[in-house]
Curated annotation (Swiss-Prot):
Pfam families: Asp. Residues 81-435 form the Peptidase A1 domain. The gene is BACE. It comes from Strongylocentrotus purpuratus. It is an enzyme of class 3 (hydrolase). GO terms for molecular function: aspartic-type endopeptidase activity. Disulfide bonds join C222-C439, C291-C469, C345-C397. Residues 1-31 form the signal peptide. Keywords: Aspartyl protease, Disulfide bond, Hydrolase, Membrane, Protease, Signal, Transmembrane, Transmembrane helix, Zymogen. The keyword Transmembrane helix applies. This is Beta-secretase. Its main location: membrane. One of its GO terms (cellular component) is endosome. CDD domains: beta_secretase_like.
Amino acid sequence: MHFSLPTSRIVVVVPAAAICIVCVLIETCTAARSHVYTIPLRKGKETSFAETVGEPVRTNQVNVSVEEQKNNIRGRPGLGYYIEVDIGTPPQKLNVLIDTGSSNFAVAASSHNAISTYYRRNESSTYEDQGTYVKVPYTQGEWSGDLGQDLVQIASLGNQSFQANIAAITESKMFFLNDSRWQGILGLGYAEIARPDSSVEPFFDSLTSQTSIQDIFALQMCGALASTNDTNLGSSADGPVEEVIGSMNIGGLDASLYHGTMQYAPLRDEWFYEVIMTDIRVGNDSLGLDCKEYNFDKTIVDSGTTNLRLPVRVFEAITNAIKAHTTKHMPDVPSEFWTGMNLMCPTDSTSPYEPYHWFPTLTLDLQSTNQGQAFSLVVSPQQYLRRDYDHEDKKNCFKFAIAPSTNHAGAVIGAVIMEGFYVVFDRENKRVGFARSTCPGACEKTGTCVGNSPLITEAFNIDFDASDCGYDRSTSYDPALTITAYVLAAICLVCLIPVIVFALTHQINKRCKGRRGRGVVNHHRLDQEGLAENEPNSDP
């Protein structure tokens, strides 16, 4: 599943075109740049996280503690995590996918064979049609529909309701997933990537502007690290996979959901939740690439994408390094496993978890908010080897949860990585926080954890400016915009040709007239001189 928007802010610089016509040099310079629209965010009073952890979330009508927001999201491996919302008057209950990689709030508004219910806007007395068509393509799937507004409530926030922009999905392609149990998507990104444009206020902006809820939320998604009491992670021959449980804290943090110190990465920009990756290690060995390679053309934290996605060169490097670690223990891993096209189904394992022992940990280093420092996310094999079940052969299998990015989508820290951590989206202070999740603690107690549990290190010094690792989009190349720029330049040139021809004709005519005039004068002077020479000399 990959519901990150294929959006890239591009600044295209078209080189000057020099065209010479009849020794006249014409230079046409065209620059094309995408427009940036900004919707001001509501900014509350400055507070430290110590003040928000475990405190009540204040709204216009009720007080809700973050303690009451535990286990309010559910998910299924590979199909995303969702939260229950009430929409309209009277309320209609729907489940929506939690997606930090997009910014539109959209729900099904017509029947579909992959969903059990949908939003009936004609039955809501508070629905308002905005008369705007919206279409959102993702790197996987797309949907289109009509933009409107209605009252929305999040069940775990009590009876608090607010007016939100809602896209009523009337058509979709490869968007709704069988057995996913969600009927819409909750985009939690910034206004800049909202569709059709940034004038559409995103869900979380509406929530914080209409209530006194602080501009922060956090996600704990347990996934592969939950105990067997909380989930049955692989599909079974007896039925579909069970759901996993997690928590979404809105307006504050729950200290009981993480261990140790929270480490923060600064937001590079407010569109996606973009951070900067400074290095990747397999086991103890760095991939050794220029750090700009890791962030080509961005690195984002995206709950709506299942896998860890990496730029092609980085994907090839990390895959080769993992192969080198595992080949001596598991020489028969099919090549299609590494590309995600096939499952790995061990036949001689004494335990369905044994392959975890032969795969290395991965370490993702991120820029820290502490100047001149970075911190590490240590990723367990349990996270990037997703358990799956082969119904045909009735085997426990594994799927490689690292994939190459497509269409310059950049690096995506998806759900399989986030599942090891308590992840904080501190919009008010423009940073993303990571701490070790309490989810692994459950499986440690029951003895079901295998391999290295996810870890997070303290911030450490680096001898370079991490900001230099960010990809410079100001020199990015977009063929479509470049072609448009050249077409406009050609139109300008066509318009200039008549002016140039007229100017040249005028100059030529002027010079020709001047030459004819000088020719008459010279001829007259020669005639006079000739007459003078032929006259008789009157001197004695």
